[in-house]
């Protein structure tokens, strides 16, 4: 569920260049393996309102078009993906890696990025991203035709997501991408990103937060489904296996 609880990192880092002092803070997210990094002065990484950029450590071609991503993946082993928002950076790490081993380096790289004001991605990034697809994977999305009336419903859904739902998710270091609405089944298709990826509470957020709100305001909405790529599906299955294994071990120890 949306927590939107911000906790300051214990060791903020300052970076001074010839013009200004940059102060970076870290905020916790509902996902213990994701942290949100941002400037206390509101320094921007992208134009406000821009669509968040997600880069995984396996996206070699995309990494080559982002100096910040190159440096983070090279100098911070264990970082699985990063999401660049308009004024924040969300880092997802491997659950076996401790934040203390990578957080200072990430903060240092981000402070330098903001201090020098360089573009976070190259001009060719979006063209490469479109050519690559979503992480090199083909995501199965049903195709459906919309009448003029259906288009109005779809626009209403998108407006609700952008104005009522997306701000809360961005605050927690994630993002949401509206992929469409099937008028025949009433199904809304969404893609969660950033801190929402591989988060144990993402399904709760989806069903009891997003789905409930959309159903309340739009009668035509019957269900909300999250679109995932193969890597996300595998990660969630492995997480479920681990939870069951831990629960089984706990029960066994109690029996003894």
From Swiss-Prot:
Function: Involved in iron homeostasis within the mitochondrion where it is involved in the assembly of iron-sulfur proteins. Together with BOL3, required during the last step of iron-sulfur protein assembly when the iron-sulfur cluster is inserted into the target protein. Required for protecting iron sulfur clusters from oxidative damage.
Annotated protein name in UniProt: NifU-like protein, mitochondrial
Single GO cellular component term: mitochondrial matrix
Organism: Saccharomyces cerevisiae (strain ATCC 204508 / S288c)
Main subcellular location: mitochondrion
Keywords for the protein's UniProt record, in alphabetical order: Mitochondrion, Transit peptide
Family in the record: Belongs to the NifU family.
Subcellular location: Mitochondrion matrix
Additional record remark: Present with 11300 molecules/cell in log phase SD medium.
GO biological process: [4Fe-4S] cluster assembly; iron-sulfur cluster assembly
Gene Ontology molecular-function annotations: 4 iron, 4 sulfur cluster binding; iron ion binding
Summary of subunit composition and partner proteins: Homodimer; in absence of BOL3, probably bridged by an iron-sulfure cluster. Interacts with BOL3. Interacts with apo-target proteins, such as ACO1, LYS4, ACO2 and SDH2.
Domain notes: The CxxC motif may bind a [4Fe-4S] cluster.
Disrupted gene: phenotype observed: Cells are impaired in growth on synthetic complete medium with acetate as a carbon source due to defects in mitochondrial [4Fe-4S] cluster formation.
Sequence motif CxxC motif, residues: 196-199
């Amino acid at each position: 569920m949306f927590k939107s609880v911000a906790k300051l990192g214990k060791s903020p880092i300052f970076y001074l260049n010839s013009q200004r002092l940059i102060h970076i803070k870290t905020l916790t997210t509902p996902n213990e393996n994701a942290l949100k990094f941002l400037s206390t002065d509101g320094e921007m990484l992208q134009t406000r309102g821009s669509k968040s950029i997600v880069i995984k450590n396996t996206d070699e071609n995309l990494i080559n078009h982002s100096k910040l991503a190159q440096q983070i993946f090279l100098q911070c082993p264990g970082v699985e993906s990063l999401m660049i928002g308009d004024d924040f950076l969300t880092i997802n790490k491997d659950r076996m890696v401790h934040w203390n081993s990578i957080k200072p380096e990430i903060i240092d790289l981000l402070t330098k990025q903001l201090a020098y004001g360089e573009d976070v991605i190259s001009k060719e990034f979006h063209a490469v991203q479109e050519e690559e697809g979503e992480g090199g994977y083909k995501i199965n999305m049903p195709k459906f035709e919309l009448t003029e009336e259906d288009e109005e419903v779809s626009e209403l859904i998108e407006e609700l997501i952008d104005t009522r739902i997306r701000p809360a998710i961005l605050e927690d270091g994630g993002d949401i991408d509206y992929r469409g609405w099937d008028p025949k089944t009433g199904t809304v298709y969404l893609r969660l990103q950033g801190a929402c990826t591989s988060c144990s509470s993402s399904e709760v957020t989806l069903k009891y937060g997003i789905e409930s709100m959309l159903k309340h305001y739009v009668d035509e909405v019957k269900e909300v489904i999250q679109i995932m790529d193969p890597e996300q599906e595998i990660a969630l299955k492995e997480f479920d296996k681990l939870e069951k294994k831990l629960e089984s071990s706990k029960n066994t120890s109690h029996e003894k």
